[in-house]
């Protein structure tokens, strides 16, 4: 079992990161733009080095993101299965407009993401 990792003390970026079953869940928080994406990129790189399974990004506390996040998710997807939970109308629209909704699946819970991503992986 891999350990939980805390990031950013609840600020913008990755506020929590931990293994849940056979997936790793990273909670993103705040307004992710150029000023804060490096936090997400570094946290993801750490997880990719330490954990062999799928990554699930929890977006429930994300108030803004731009195409940098979509690019990051697609880059991560080339290395591991990726799923999203806690999307909102803004995120759903961003995925639709960028044509990435089909390759970045959304789920109702970490458990649903785990079931689908471990079956697909």
Where are these regions (language model features)?
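Short acidic-hydrophobic, aromatic-tinged amphipathic segments that line or gate anion-handling sites
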Residues: 103-112
């Amino acid at each position: 079992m891999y350990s939980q990792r805390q990031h950013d003390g609840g600020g913008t970026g990755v506020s929590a990161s931990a293994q849940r079953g056979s997936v790793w869940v990273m909670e993103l928080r705040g307004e992710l733009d150029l000023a804060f994406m490096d936090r997400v990129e570094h946290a993801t790189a750490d997880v990719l080095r330490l954990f062999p399974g799928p990554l699930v990004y929890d977006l429930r506390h994300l108030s803004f993101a731009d195409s940098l996040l979509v690019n990051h998710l697609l880059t991560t997807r080339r290395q591991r299965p990726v799923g999203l939970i806690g999307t909102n109308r803004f995120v759903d629209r961003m995925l639709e407009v960028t044509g990435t909704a089909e390759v970045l699946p959304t789920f109702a819970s970490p458990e649903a993401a785990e079931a689908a991503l471990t079956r697909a992986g």
